[in-house]
Amino acid sequence: MPHLAELVAKAKAAVEGAQDIAALDLVRVEYLGKKGHLTLQMTSLRELPAEERPAAGAVINQAKQEVQEALNARKEKLESAVLNARLAAETIDVSLPGRRMENGGLHPVTRTIERIETFFGELGFSVESGPEIEDDYHNFDALNIPAHHPARADHDTFWFDATRLLRTQTSGVQIRTMQEQQPPIRIIVPGRVYRNDYDQTHTPMFHQMEGLIVDRDISFTNLKGTLHDFLRNFFEEDLQIRFRPSYFPFTEPSAEVDVMGKNGKWLEVLGCGMVHPNVLRNVGIDPEIYSGFAFGMGMERLTMLRYGVTDLRAFFENDLRFLKQFK
Protein backbone atom coordinates (compact mmCIF):
# COMPACT_ATOMS: atom_id res chain seq x y z
CA MET A 1 0.00 0.00 0.00
CA PRO A 2 2.56 2.52 -1.14
CA HIS A 3 -0.01 5.33 -1.56
CA LEU A 4 -1.54 5.03 1.96
CA ALA A 5 0.85 7.57 3.44
CA GLU A 6 -0.05 9.93 0.61
CA LEU A 7 -3.77 9.49 1.40
CA VAL A 8 -3.19 10.29 5.07
CA ALA A 9 -1.19 13.37 4.16
CA LYS A 10 -3.94 14.58 1.81
CA ALA A 11 -6.59 13.88 4.45
CA LYS A 12 -4.70 15.86 7.09
CA ALA A 13 -4.23 18.74 4.67
CA ALA A 14 -7.95 18.72 3.87
CA VAL A 15 -8.75 18.66 7.58
CA GLU A 16 -6.56 21.69 8.24
CA GLY A 17 -8.09 23.47 5.28
CA ALA A 18 -11.65 23.10 6.56
CA GLN A 19 -12.87 26.50 7.79
CA ASP A 20 -16.07 25.39 9.49
CA ILE A 21 -17.78 22.32 10.93
CA ALA A 22 -19.76 21.66 7.74
CA ALA A 23 -16.61 21.60 5.57
CA LEU A 24 -14.87 19.42 8.11
CA ASP A 25 -17.71 16.91 7.99
CA LEU A 26 -17.34 16.69 4.20
CA VAL A 27 -13.67 15.78 4.68
CA ARG A 28 -14.67 13.09 7.18
CA VAL A 29 -17.13 11.57 4.72
CA GLU A 30 -14.57 11.73 1.90
CA TYR A 31 -11.96 9.74 3.81
CA LEU A 32 -13.81 7.81 6.53
CA GLY A 33 -17.34 7.47 5.13
CA LYS A 34 -18.81 4.24 3.79
CA LYS A 35 -17.23 4.93 0.41
CA GLY A 36 -14.31 6.95 1.74
CA HIS A 37 -10.75 6.52 0.53
CA LEU A 38 -9.51 4.86 3.70
CA THR A 39 -12.63 2.71 4.01
CA LEU A 40 -11.99 1.39 0.48
CA GLN A 41 -8.47 0.49 1.57
CA MET A 42 -9.98 -1.87 4.12
CA THR A 43 -12.17 -3.56 1.48
CA SER A 44 -9.12 -4.10 -0.72
CA LEU A 45 -7.61 -6.35 1.92
CA ARG A 46 -9.45 -9.33 0.44
CA GLU A 47 -7.18 -9.09 -2.59
CA LEU A 48 -4.11 -9.75 -0.43
CA PRO A 49 -2.86 -13.18 0.58
CA ALA A 50 -4.29 -14.27 3.92
CA GLU A 51 -0.95 -14.14 5.70
CA GLU A 52 -0.48 -10.45 4.73
CA ARG A 53 -3.93 -9.22 5.71
CA PRO A 54 -3.38 -8.73 9.47
CA ALA A 55 -0.32 -6.57 9.03
CA ALA A 56 -1.93 -4.56 6.23
CA GLY A 57 -5.12 -4.12 8.26
CA ALA A 58 -3.14 -2.80 11.22
CA VAL A 59 -1.45 -0.23 8.97
CA ILE A 60 -4.78 0.91 7.52
CA ASN A 61 -6.35 1.17 11.00
CA GLN A 62 -3.39 3.25 12.15
CA ALA A 63 -3.90 5.54 9.17
CA LYS A 64 -7.62 5.87 9.91
CA GLN A 65 -6.84 6.64 13.55
CA GLU A 66 -4.43 9.40 12.55
CA VAL A 67 -7.06 10.98 10.30
CA GLN A 68 -9.74 10.64 12.98
CA GLU A 69 -7.48 12.30 15.55
CA ALA A 70 -6.81 15.13 13.11
CA LEU A 71 -10.56 15.50 12.56
CA ASN A 72 -11.24 15.60 16.30
CA ALA A 73 -8.52 18.16 16.93
CA ARG A 74 -9.69 20.37 14.06
CA LYS A 75 -13.33 20.10 15.20
CA GLU A 76 -12.41 21.12 18.72
CA LYS A 77 -10.44 24.08 17.37
CA LEU A 78 -13.30 25.22 15.12
CA GLU A 79 -15.88 24.88 17.91
CA SER A 80 -13.63 26.85 20.24
CA ALA A 81 -13.28 29.57 17.61
CA VAL A 82 -17.07 29.75 17.23
CA LEU A 83 -17.53 29.98 21.00
CA ASN A 84 -14.87 32.67 21.34
CA ALA A 85 -16.47 34.69 18.55
CA ARG A 86 -19.86 34.46 20.25
CA LEU A 87 -18.42 35.42 23.62
CA ALA A 88 -16.65 38.37 22.05
CA ALA A 89 -19.91 39.51 20.49
CA GLU A 90 -21.70 39.16 23.81
CA THR A 91 -19.01 40.72 25.96
CA ILE A 92 -20.44 43.09 28.57
CA ASP A 93 -18.83 46.49 28.54
CA VAL A 94 -18.39 47.06 32.26
CA SER A 95 -17.63 50.72 31.60
CA LEU A 96 -21.21 51.33 30.44
CA PRO A 97 -23.59 52.73 33.07
CA GLY A 98 -25.77 50.02 34.58
CA ARG A 99 -29.53 50.02 34.78
CA ARG A 100 -30.68 52.17 37.63
CA MET A 101 -32.61 50.45 40.38
CA GLU A 102 -35.56 52.69 41.10
CA ASN A 103 -36.74 52.34 44.67
CA GLY A 104 -40.30 53.36 45.31
CA GLY A 105 -41.24 55.83 48.00
CA LEU A 106 -44.32 56.95 49.83
CA HIS A 107 -46.25 59.90 48.45
CA PRO A 108 -45.69 62.98 50.64
CA VAL A 109 -49.39 63.12 51.54
CA THR A 110 -49.25 59.46 52.58
CA ARG A 111 -46.22 60.29 54.73
CA THR A 112 -48.21 63.02 56.42
CA ILE A 113 -51.19 60.76 57.07
CA GLU A 114 -49.00 58.03 58.53
CA ARG A 115 -47.12 60.51 60.70
CA ILE A 116 -50.38 61.86 62.13
CA GLU A 117 -51.82 58.38 62.65
CA THR A 118 -48.70 57.41 64.59
CA PHE A 119 -48.93 60.46 66.87
CA PHE A 120 -52.59 60.04 67.71
CA GLY A 121 -52.26 56.27 67.93
CA GLU A 122 -49.88 56.79 70.84
CA LEU A 123 -52.61 58.85 72.52
CA GLY A 124 -55.08 55.99 72.25
CA PHE A 125 -56.97 57.12 69.15
CA SER A 126 -58.22 54.43 66.77
CA VAL A 127 -58.46 54.92 63.00
CA GLU A 128 -61.93 54.80 61.45
CA SER A 129 -63.14 55.00 57.85
CA GLY A 130 -66.42 55.42 56.03
CA PRO A 131 -68.07 55.68 52.61
CA GLU A 132 -67.00 58.37 50.16
CA ILE A 133 -70.45 58.36 48.58
CA GLU A 134 -72.47 59.76 51.45
CA ASP A 135 -76.07 60.67 52.14
CA ASP A 136 -77.14 64.17 53.07
CA TYR A 137 -78.11 63.13 56.59
CA HIS A 138 -74.62 62.01 57.63
CA ASN A 139 -72.84 64.69 55.62
CA PHE A 140 -75.07 67.62 56.64
CA ASP A 141 -78.20 67.10 58.76
CA ALA A 142 -76.66 65.15 61.63
CA LEU A 143 -73.80 67.65 61.75
CA ASN A 144 -76.18 70.53 62.45
CA ILE A 145 -75.85 71.90 58.91
CA PRO A 146 -79.34 73.12 57.93
CA ALA A 147 -80.88 72.84 54.49
CA HIS A 148 -80.24 76.50 53.67
CA HIS A 149 -76.52 76.33 54.50
CA PRO A 150 -74.23 77.48 51.62
CA ALA A 151 -72.19 74.25 51.80
CA ARG A 152 -75.15 72.39 50.27
CA ALA A 153 -75.09 74.50 47.12
CA ASP A 154 -74.37 72.81 43.79
CA HIS A 155 -71.32 74.97 43.19
CA ASP A 156 -69.64 73.59 46.35
CA THR A 157 -70.82 69.96 46.41
CA PHE A 158 -70.87 67.11 43.89
CA TRP A 159 -74.43 65.74 44.08
CA PHE A 160 -75.55 62.46 42.51
CA ASP A 161 -79.22 63.11 43.21
CA ALA A 162 -81.33 64.87 45.83
CA THR A 163 -79.89 62.87 48.72
CA ARG A 164 -76.56 61.33 47.64
CA LEU A 165 -73.28 63.14 47.17
CA LEU A 166 -69.51 62.81 47.24
CA ARG A 167 -68.71 63.58 50.85
CA THR A 168 -67.41 67.08 51.45
CA GLN A 169 -65.82 66.17 54.78
CA THR A 170 -64.90 63.11 56.80
CA SER A 171 -67.15 64.28 59.66
CA GLY A 172 -69.84 61.86 58.52
CA VAL A 173 -67.69 59.04 59.90
CA GLN A 174 -67.87 60.70 63.31
CA ILE A 175 -71.67 60.49 63.14
CA ARG A 176 -71.59 56.83 62.12
CA THR A 177 -69.12 56.01 64.88
CA MET A 178 -71.15 57.76 67.57
CA GLN A 179 -74.28 55.96 66.36
CA GLU A 180 -72.55 52.60 66.70
CA GLN A 181 -70.42 53.14 69.80
CA GLN A 182 -71.04 54.48 73.27
CA PRO A 183 -68.60 56.90 74.91
CA PRO A 184 -65.78 57.03 75.62
CA ILE A 185 -64.88 57.55 71.96
CA ARG A 186 -61.47 58.54 70.69
CA ILE A 187 -60.98 58.34 66.91
CA ILE A 188 -59.24 59.88 63.94
CA VAL A 189 -60.66 59.63 60.43
CA PRO A 190 -58.32 60.05 57.43
CA GLY A 191 -59.85 59.98 53.96
CA ARG A 192 -60.59 61.57 50.61
CA VAL A 193 -63.17 64.33 50.38
CA TYR A 194 -64.57 66.23 47.40
CA ARG A 195 -65.46 69.84 46.74
CA ASN A 196 -66.18 71.68 43.53
CA ASP A 197 -63.08 73.88 43.52
CA TYR A 198 -59.79 73.95 41.61
CA ASP A 199 -56.95 76.46 41.81
CA GLN A 200 -53.44 76.81 43.23
CA THR A 201 -54.62 76.03 46.76
CA HIS A 202 -57.72 73.88 46.07
CA THR A 203 -58.38 70.65 44.19
CA PRO A 204 -61.70 68.83 43.58
CA MET A 205 -60.42 65.90 45.63
CA PHE A 206 -58.17 66.19 48.65
CA HIS A 207 -57.38 64.38 51.88
CA GLN A 208 -58.72 65.32 55.26
CA MET A 209 -58.15 64.09 58.80
CA GLU A 210 -60.87 64.39 61.44
CA GLY A 211 -60.36 63.82 65.13
CA LEU A 212 -63.02 63.23 67.78
CA ILE A 213 -63.11 62.63 71.52
CA VAL A 214 -66.36 62.13 73.43
CA ASP A 215 -66.24 61.39 77.16
CA ARG A 216 -67.17 62.84 80.50
CA ASP A 217 -65.66 66.18 81.50
CA ILE A 218 -63.92 66.92 78.18
CA SER A 219 -63.05 70.63 78.02
CA PHE A 220 -61.59 73.17 75.64
CA THR A 221 -58.40 72.96 77.67
CA ASN A 222 -58.08 69.30 76.64
CA LEU A 223 -58.55 70.35 73.02
CA LYS A 224 -55.86 73.05 73.20
CA GLY A 225 -53.37 70.80 74.94
CA THR A 226 -53.86 68.00 72.42
CA LEU A 227 -53.45 70.25 69.40
CA HIS A 228 -50.47 72.11 70.88
CA ASP A 229 -48.67 68.80 71.36
CA PHE A 230 -49.67 67.58 67.91
CA LEU A 231 -48.52 70.65 65.99
CA ARG A 232 -45.18 70.84 67.75
CA ASN A 233 -44.64 67.15 67.10
CA PHE A 234 -45.68 67.38 63.46
CA PHE A 235 -43.54 70.39 62.56
CA GLU A 236 -40.74 69.37 64.94
CA GLU A 237 -40.51 72.91 66.27
CA ASP A 238 -41.58 74.79 69.38
CA LEU A 239 -44.05 76.79 67.29
CA GLN A 240 -45.98 79.85 68.32
CA ILE A 241 -49.64 78.77 68.10
CA ARG A 242 -52.86 80.73 68.41
CA PHE A 243 -56.54 79.84 68.52
CA ARG A 244 -58.88 82.26 66.73
CA PRO A 245 -62.63 82.26 67.42
CA SER A 246 -64.50 80.94 64.41
CA TYR A 247 -67.78 79.30 63.43
CA PHE A 248 -68.60 75.74 62.41
CA PRO A 249 -72.17 74.40 62.59
CA PHE A 250 -71.07 71.20 64.32
CA THR A 251 -68.92 72.71 67.09
CA GLU A 252 -69.55 75.34 69.74
CA PRO A 253 -67.36 77.13 70.64
CA SER A 254 -65.30 76.86 67.47
CA ALA A 255 -61.80 78.00 66.62
CA GLU A 256 -59.27 78.03 63.85
CA VAL A 257 -55.67 77.29 64.71
CA ASP A 258 -52.75 79.24 63.27
CA VAL A 259 -49.01 78.76 63.53
CA MET A 260 -46.38 81.45 63.10
CA GLY A 261 -44.53 80.99 59.83
CA LYS A 262 -40.86 81.66 59.19
CA ASN A 263 -41.86 84.86 57.40
CA GLY A 264 -43.43 86.23 60.56
CA LYS A 265 -46.99 85.70 59.33
CA TRP A 266 -49.72 83.55 60.83
CA LEU A 267 -50.66 80.45 58.81
CA GLU A 268 -53.99 78.67 59.26
CA VAL A 269 -53.52 74.93 59.77
CA LEU A 270 -56.80 73.46 61.07
CA GLY A 271 -60.26 74.02 62.51
CA CYS A 272 -61.60 72.70 65.79
CA GLY A 273 -64.13 73.13 68.56
CA MET A 274 -66.27 71.49 71.20
CA VAL A 275 -68.83 69.09 69.74
CA HIS A 276 -72.15 70.93 69.42
CA PRO A 277 -74.85 69.61 71.80
CA ASN A 278 -77.22 69.20 68.84
CA VAL A 279 -74.75 66.82 67.19
CA LEU A 280 -74.57 64.72 70.34
CA ARG A 281 -78.36 64.64 70.58
CA ASN A 282 -78.64 63.60 66.92
CA VAL A 283 -76.70 60.42 67.70
CA GLY A 284 -78.41 59.68 71.01
CA ILE A 285 -75.68 60.92 73.36
CA ASP A 286 -76.77 63.06 76.30
CA PRO A 287 -74.85 66.38 76.19
CA GLU A 288 -75.61 66.89 79.88
CA ILE A 289 -73.44 63.87 80.68
CA TYR A 290 -70.91 63.78 77.88
CA SER A 291 -68.92 66.40 76.03
CA GLY A 292 -66.28 66.21 73.38
CA PHE A 293 -64.05 68.03 70.99
CA ALA A 294 -63.40 67.63 67.29
CA PHE A 295 -60.82 68.91 64.85
CA GLY A 296 -60.27 68.70 61.13
CA MET A 297 -57.32 69.43 58.89
CA GLY A 298 -56.34 69.14 55.25
CA MET A 299 -53.50 66.71 54.64
CA GLU A 300 -52.26 68.50 51.54
CA ARG A 301 -52.12 71.83 53.36
CA LEU A 302 -50.13 70.39 56.25
CA THR A 303 -47.81 68.66 53.79
CA MET A 304 -47.29 71.93 51.92
CA LEU A 305 -46.40 73.73 55.14
CA ARG A 306 -44.11 70.97 56.36
CA TYR A 307 -42.14 70.64 53.11
CA GLY A 308 -42.42 74.17 51.72
CA VAL A 309 -44.54 73.24 48.67
CA THR A 310 -46.26 76.25 47.11
CA ASP A 311 -48.69 74.66 44.63
CA LEU A 312 -51.19 72.09 45.90
CA ARG A 313 -51.67 70.68 42.41
CA ALA A 314 -48.12 69.28 42.40
CA PHE A 315 -49.30 66.48 44.68
CA PHE A 316 -51.63 65.16 41.96
CA GLU A 317 -49.51 65.52 38.81
CA ASN A 318 -47.37 62.37 39.31
CA ASP A 319 -44.18 64.19 38.36
CA LEU A 320 -41.35 61.92 39.51
CA ARG A 321 -38.95 64.86 39.67
CA PHE A 322 -41.19 66.31 42.37
CA LEU A 323 -42.04 63.07 44.17
CA LYS A 324 -38.45 61.81 44.40
CA GLN A 325 -37.61 64.72 46.70
CA PHE A 326 -39.59 63.05 49.48
CA LYS A 327 -37.86 59.63 49.49
Swiss-Prot record:
GO process annotations (BP): phenylalanyl-tRNA aminoacylation
InterPro entries associated with the record: aa-tRNA-synth_II (IPR006195), aa-tRNA-synth_II/BPL/LPL (IPR045864), Phe-tRNA-synth_IIc_asu (IPR004529), Phe-tRNA_ligase_II_N (IPR004188), Phe_tRNA_ligase_alpha1_bac (IPR022911), Phenylalanyl-tRNA_Synthase (IPR002319), tRNA-bd_arm (IPR010978)
UniProt catalytic activity: tRNA(Phe) + L-phenylalanine + ATP = L-phenylalanyl-tRNA(Phe) + AMP + diphosphate + H(+)
GO terms for cellular component: cytoplasm
Disulfide feature: none
Quaternary structure and partners: Tetramer of two alpha and two beta subunits.
Protein name as catalogued: Phenylalanine--tRNA ligase alpha subunit
Native source organism of the sequence: Yersinia pestis
Gene: pheS
